[in-house]
């Protein structure tokens, strides 16, 4: 029996439970489930069917009650695996939690990335380590993530799939958060200085995530980016207290504003206390709101002697008001060696944000494309791809996007010297677009 058939049969078997919990809304889900079953019977298994089934499950779980979510997850796993499944998550973390057994020796094509994190999330007792509520202090530490370099598409943040009946993460196939070790601020700085001294480059890459992201997934994404970009320095993560719930967009908006001064202090630490030569910052989506505010307030020309230079600043799909971004860009002009903005005309999440706010977002392209002095704007519409089903994570999920970012970070090339992009128009309205 195929994995797809087994999952469809299991979903059909719990239909009475789902009908009771969804009420009148179950009718549309039932019809879609029957349509998927009919396609399997008619056409057999296919990549398209698996993709649609995955999307169906995602919608089902987003809108389900906690009782229904439990029924769905329990139906999709063997009895012996139910106790090892992390409630509320999408993959199993082997040996997660402080003080647990170490992971076995890793295969040659798997690398472990230490992600040095700062977070203002509230600590959690579970495998999530940090939850979606605001904490009283900024916590520091190292999250260790294993990343396979083979059997995974460049940019892909792999994890087990329910519908493939994968219930445990496999280091040879999946990006896994293997451990999280907290420490004091002083210990964090000392450890970072020590490991930076052994790096191939005396550089730091700081990643700040966007809306609807858990601490675990933020750490996994930071490590995946470091590996796929072939970054030769050390990796930092600032994880603000996103609620990690697509229905709580406005909650995340309030939290990123609250978190901005914590992020700014973390950037200051990276610049002035680590001994790094260069700091690169990559912000995604709503995380750009904290980044632009930090750039507004940090005068890199007035940093103490021996501080790192703020080298490459990357605004990836920024979910910030376009007019506000333009105003702030004038204030932080010249504070980094180079600023680059990646935009797209096919970003559904940004279009949804525009619908909510009534005004264009800085990450949109076409008529809304932001072109300002001091920022290299790249229209990534031609190579845009989807990681979340919303065409919103192309910055980390498309080969040519990653190649261009790698040229920025590793070779510090200006756009005219980068292979993937070409100039469109002339100054002062010049921007860059991907070659056909």
Per-region residue spans from a language model:
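Charged, low-complexity interaction regions
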Residues: 17-28, 42-48, 62-69
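Short amphipathic alpha-helical heptad-repeat segments
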Residues: 4-11, 29, 49-53
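Short terminal alpha-helical segments
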Residues: 1-23
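Gly/Ala-rich beta-loop-alpha elbow adjacent to hydrolase catalytic centers
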Residues: 283, 287, 291
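The conserved beta1-alpha1 loop
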Residues: 206-210
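Short substrate-entry loop that stabilizes the transition state in hydrolases
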Residues: 213-217
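Lipolytic serine-hydrolase domain surface
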Residues: 77-200, 219-235, 239-278, 295-312, ...
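Alpha/beta-hydrolase fold active-site loops
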Residues: 203
């Amino acid at each position: 029996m195929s994995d797809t058939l087994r999952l469809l049969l299991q979903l059909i078997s719990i239909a009475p439970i789902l009908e009771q919990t969804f009420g009148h809304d179950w009718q549309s889900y039932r019809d879609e489930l029957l349509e998927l079953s009919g396609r399997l019977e008619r056409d057999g298994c296919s990549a398209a069917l698996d993709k649609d089934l995955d999307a169906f499950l995602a919608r089902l779980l987003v809108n389900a009650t906690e009782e229904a979510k439990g029924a769905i997850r329990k139906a999709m796993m063997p009895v012996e695996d139910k106790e090892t499944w992390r409630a509320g998550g999408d993959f199993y973390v082997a040996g997660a939690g402080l003080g647990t057994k170490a992971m076995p020796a890793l295969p040659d094509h798997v690398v472990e990335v230490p992600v040095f994190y700062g977070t203002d999330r509230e600590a959690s007792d579970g495998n999530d380590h940090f939850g979606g509520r605001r904490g009283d202090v900024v916590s520091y530490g190292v999250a260790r993530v294993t990343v396979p370099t083979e059997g995974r598409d460049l940019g892909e943040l792999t994890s087990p799939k329910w519908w493939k009946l994968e219930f445990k993460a496999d280091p040879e196939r999946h990006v896994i958060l293997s451990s999280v070790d907290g420490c004091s601020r002083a210990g964090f700085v000392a450890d970072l200085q020590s490991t930076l001294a052994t790096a191939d480059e005396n550089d730091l890459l700081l990643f700040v995530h966007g809306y609807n992201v858990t601490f675990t997934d933020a750490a996994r994404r930071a490590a995946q980016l470091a590996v796929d970009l072939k970054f030769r320095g050390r990796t930092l993560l600032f994880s603000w207290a996103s609620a990690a719930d697509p229905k709580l967009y406005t909650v995340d908006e309030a939290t990123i504003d609250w978190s901005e001064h914590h992020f700014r202090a973390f950037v200051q630490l990276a610049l002035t206390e680590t001994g790094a030569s260069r700091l690169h910052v990559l912000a995604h989506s709503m995380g750009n709101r904290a980044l632009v505010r930090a750039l507004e307030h940090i005068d890199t020309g007035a940093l103490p002697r021996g501080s790192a230079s703020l080298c490459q600043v990357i605004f990836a799909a920024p979910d910030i008001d376009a007019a506000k971004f333009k105003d702030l860009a004038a204030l932080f002009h010249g504070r980094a060696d180079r600023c680059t903005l990646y935009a797209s005309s096919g970003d559904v999440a940004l279009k949804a944000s525009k619908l909510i706010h009534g005004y264009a977002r800085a990450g949109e392209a076409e008529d809304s494309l932001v072109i300002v002095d001091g920022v290299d704007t790249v229209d990534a519409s031609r190579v845009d791809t989807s990681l979340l089903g919303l065409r919103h994570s192309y910055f980390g999920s498309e080969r040519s996007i990653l190649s261009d970012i790698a040229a920025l970070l590793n070779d510090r090339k200006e756009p005219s010297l980068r292979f993937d992009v070409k100039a469109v128009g002339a100054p002062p309205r010049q921007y860059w677009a991907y070659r056909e």
